Amino acid sequence: MRNVTLTDIFQLPFARKYLKRAGLAHAVTVTQKAYDLACKEAVNTDLATKAALLHDIGHYTWYRDGEWDFDLYKQNDIHAIKGAERAHKMLIRLGENPEAAKEIAVAILFHTDSYFQGTVQRTSLQEVVAQADEADEEPNGNHHYKVISESEAAEMLADLDDMIEKQCHSNTHLQQSV
C-alpha cells in the first residue's frame, strides 16, 4: 500500500501551481516515461514516478524585456535544488514515508547537471528520472510549453496510479508466496 499517490500530489493546489509553471504536459510525459523505464530497469516505480512528476517544480521562468531568455535561465538555473526541497516538504506533509521522500527529493536534485560542473554518479532511481526527462527534452526548453488540460493530466496520472498499485500488489503477493 502506497502512502501517497500521484493523484494525491496532483490534487494539491500548491503542486498544480508549480507543475503548470514548469509545464504540466512535460511533467506527465516524463512520469509516463519514468514508469516504463523503471519497469524495464527493475527500479521502484512508485518512487520513480513521483520524482518524475515533481522533477521540475523548482523552475523559475527567466524573462528579459518580456521574452523568455533561455540563455539567462541556463546561466542561473538552480531549479533542481529548489524543486528537491519543495517536493520533500510536500511529500512529508502528505504523509509519505520519510525515507521515500528523501529518495524522491535526491532523485529530483540529480535529474539534471545544469547547475553544477562535472559529473555525478547516479543511483538507478536517479538515472531513470534523468533519462525520462532527457527523452522529452526539446531545443530551447520548448518541452515546457506543451499543453495538456488538468483533467487529461489527472486521468493519465490516475491510470499510472492503477498500474503502480497493481504492480505493488503483485510484488507483495509474490513475496508472500516465496
Where in the sequence are the language-model features?
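Short alpha-helical hairpin
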Residues: 1-12, 53-60
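Divalent metal-dependent phosphate-bond-processing catalytic cores, especially two-metal-ion Mg2+/Mn2+ enzymes
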Residues: 2-3, 18-46, 54, 64, ...
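A generic structural signal for nonpolar/aromatic side chains embedded in well-ordered alpha-helices
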Residues: 10-13, 108, 129
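His-Asp-centered metal-binding catalytic motifs of divalent-metal-dependent phosphohydrolases/nucleases
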Residues: 46-67, 83, 105-112
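Metal-dependent catalytic cores of enzymes that make or break cyclic nucleotides
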Residues: 61-77, 118
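An active-site-proximal "capping" alpha-helix that borders the catalytic cofactor pocket
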Residues: 30, 34-37, 77-93
